[in-house]
Structures are given as C-alpha cells and as structure tokens.
Amino acid sequence: MIEADRLIQPQVIEPDEVVDRAMRPKLLDEYTGQDDTRAQLKIFIEAAQKRGEALDHMLIYGPPGLGKTTLAMIVANEMGVNIKSTSGPVLEKAGDLAALLTNLEENDVLFIDEIHRLSPVVEEILYPAMEDYQLDIMIGEGPAARSIKLDLPPFTLVGATTQAGSLTSPLRARFGIPLRLEFYNIKDLSTIVIRSAKVMELEIDEEGAIEIARRSRGTPRIANRLLRRVRDFAEVKHSGAVTKVVAELALDMLDVDAEGFDYMDRKLLLAIIDKFMGGPVGLDNLAAAIGEERETIEDVLEPFLIQQGFVQRTPRGRIATQRAYNHFNLIQPEAK
C-alpha cells in the first residue's frame, strides 16, 4: 500500500485540509485553468440565473486533486445558494440521502463526492429526486410498509468522481452537464502557486513558482502542498523568500525530482524497464512486482505517467517509453 504521507499523492492529506480550504478560490473569476470548463460554466450559470431556475445536475470527473470540490463550491457561490456536502460511502441507507434532500432549499447545491461509490439502494432513491424533484420512501416494515412521495424543491446535484466509468449508465445519463477536468499546465499551476503564496503572506518570485509548478504533476493540491514544504525550508535554511534555487534545493531534499516523480513513480518505471525488459507487462504482474494494489496503479500512479508520455498502455500491457529510458539515462532496447 502507498504510504498515507506520500508528499505528491493527489488525495487529501488530513493536516492540509484546513489550509487548502483557505486557499480555494470562491468565484469563477478567481479560478485558474480549465479554460473550456470555466467558459461553459459561466454560460450555464448565467442562463440558469436569467430563468430563475436551478442549474442542471452536474458531473465533474477527472484525476484527484484537480479542484472538483472547489468547482462545486464555486457553483453554489455564483448561484447565490447554499451547498450541502457528503460522499458516496457515507450514504449507506436511503434515509441518509432522504435527510439531506428534505433539508435543501430552492436551487441549493447537493455535492456528493466519490459518487461512483453510492450503494444501489441509495442510487435508486436518487433517480426520481434528480428527474422529478420527488422523493419516494418506504414507511414502516413488513406488511404494513407503504410508499409515500415527498415533493422536493428544485436543486442541483453535483457529483464528483475519479472513476466516471464506474458510474451506472442510468445515473450517468441523468447529469445534464458533464465536465472533465484535465491536468494543469505549468503556467496555470505557477499562477495558482503565486496566489497561494499571497494568501500565506509568503514572498516568492516567478521562477520559484514555476519550479514548484513543474514538479507538481499538473495538480493544484500537490502544488499547494509542495509550496508549504518549500516555505518551511526557506524559513529555516534561507531568508524566508522562495526563489528558484531555494525551491530546487527544497524539493531535491524532499525527493521530488524535476519531473515531479517520487520513489514510487521511479519504482514503477524501473520495474517495467528492469524486471520486464521495458514491457509489455500486465497490470497484475506489475502490481505484484512493486507491492501495490492494481487499483492504486490505475488510479494514482499511472494517469500522470501516461499523460506525460513515460508509460504507454497497450492491449498486451504497460510499456516504458523512450522518455522513461531517457529519464534514467538508459538506452532503450530495440523493439521486439
């Protein structure tokens, strides 16, 4: 299992949660990156406001740490409504969902993180709520049980998931606005780093921000986490200001290399190169070779490596690319 304190893991690390909340943008104009998504949202929100209606139900999907929760909160702020947040695993019974739905006010936002992990019984309750703003619930047990319908105010369900393919077709079809978040480019990430540094009252120059962004795996959550660790280094070892040199020294010490890789990324790449002669290697064999679960490889390690061109996924298995060999100053063997 990957250690919970892996510095560049995109999932939330508990001690960082409060600080991350303070750094989050509140409105679309403050939100950096995801230009197409922002442009679409502006139109959808303005149209809903002109009609005086709830925004259509929205599914936000993509790798972890890219701002799905932040976008849900921005939608509520832009619409001028309340937001209630929960997650799929928490909603164990139909009554858990019913309690949330019956406390919504008109046009409110209900945010369900990890919506792909909803139980089937809860998902069934959600269908009429999304389509007709009605709640069908069973009262009582056994022969005396009866179904009652409750009218709900119009509301917007915002679902977030890292595994859109795991959603059932009926649930996925009920979202009128699907939004995919992509990894951020270095320019946008450096802008986020500079904004976060201002919130932290930290002096940072542009080159320092770019260096942190370059090693942040295209992920704002990782960029903010690295910024906090670089700040610690700058305050103890230097004058307190973050420059390119300070950022390089700090991140090298933290074992985050120039590509944003840590030991787990290098372990995976070297396993493909050394143990499987560059591949192809099946997912189960690769998982066994590095001592990780296949889900961890698919959901946490692989997406960035594939997106950056270090690993190629083929029908026969994973292959290390020329770029992976170059990263370790190795010569790629001739194709088999």
UniProtKB/Swiss-Prot annotation:
Family statement drawn from the similarity comment of this UniProt entry: Belongs to the RuvB family.
Protein residues bound to Mg(2+): T69
Described purpose of this protein according to its UniProt entry: The RuvA-RuvB-RuvC complex processes Holliday junction (HJ) DNA during genetic recombination and DNA repair, while the RuvA-RuvB complex plays an important role in the rescue of blocked DNA replication forks via replication fork reversal (RFR). RuvA specifically binds to HJ cruciform DNA, conferring on it an open structure. The RuvB hexamer acts as an ATP-dependent pump, pulling dsDNA into and through the RuvAB complex. RuvB forms 2 homohexamers on either side of HJ DNA bound by 1 or 2 RuvA tetramers; 4 subunits per hexamer contact DNA at a time.
HAMAP family in UniProt: DNA_HJ_migration_RuvB
Pfam families attached to this UniProt entry: AAA_lid_4, RuvB_C, RuvB_N
UniProt binding sites for DNA: R294, R313, R318
InterPro entries: AAA+_ATPase, AAA_lid_4, DNA_helicase_Holl-junc_RuvB, P-loop_NTPase, RuvB-like_N, RuvB_C, WH-like_DNA-bd_sf, WH_DNA-bd_sf
Binding site for ATP: R24, G65, K68, T69, T70, E131, D132, Y133, R174, Y184, R221
Keyword Oxidoreductase set for record: no
Species this protein is from: Shewanella piezotolerans (strain WP3 / JCM 13877)
Catalytic activity line of the entry: ATP + H2O = ADP + phosphate + H(+)
Superkingdom, taxonomy of origin: Bacteria
Free-text domain note: Has 3 domains, the large (RuvB-L) and small ATPase (RuvB-S) domains and the C-terminal head (RuvB-H) domain. The head domain binds DNA, while the ATPase domains jointly bind ATP, ADP or are empty depending on the state of the subunit in the translocation cycle. During a single DNA translocation step the structure of each domain remains the same, but their relative positions change.
Localization (cell): Cytoplasm
BP GO terms, sorted: DNA recombination; DNA repair
Spans annotated as Large ATPase domain (RuvB-L): 4-184
PANTHER family for the chain: HOLLIDAY JUNCTION BRANCH MIGRATION COMPLEX SUBUNIT RUVB (PTHR42848:SF1), PTHR42848
GO CC terms, sorted: cytoplasm; Holliday junction resolvase complex
Top EC category: hydrolase
Tagged with keyword Cytoplasm: yes
Region described as Small ATPAse domain (RuvB-S): spans on this chain: 185-255
EC identifiers of the protein: 3.6.4.-
Subunit structure: Homohexamer. Forms an RuvA(8)-RuvB(12)-Holliday junction (HJ) complex. HJ DNA is sandwiched between 2 RuvA tetramers; dsDNA enters through RuvA and exits via RuvB. An RuvB hexamer assembles on each DNA strand where it exits the tetramer. Each RuvB hexamer is contacted by two RuvA subunits (via domain III) on 2 adjacent RuvB subunits; this complex drives branch migration. In the full resolvosome a probable DNA-RuvA(4)-RuvB(12)-RuvC(2) complex forms which resolves the HJ.
Protein name (database record): Holliday junction branch migration complex subunit RuvB
Gene Ontology molecular-function annotations: ATP binding; ATP hydrolysis activity; four-way junction DNA binding; four-way junction helicase activity
Renumbered residue ranges of the record's region Head domain (RuvB-H): 258-336
Keywords for the protein's UniProt record, in alphabetical order: ATP-binding, Cytoplasm, DNA damage, DNA recombination, DNA repair, DNA-binding, Hydrolase, Nucleotide-binding
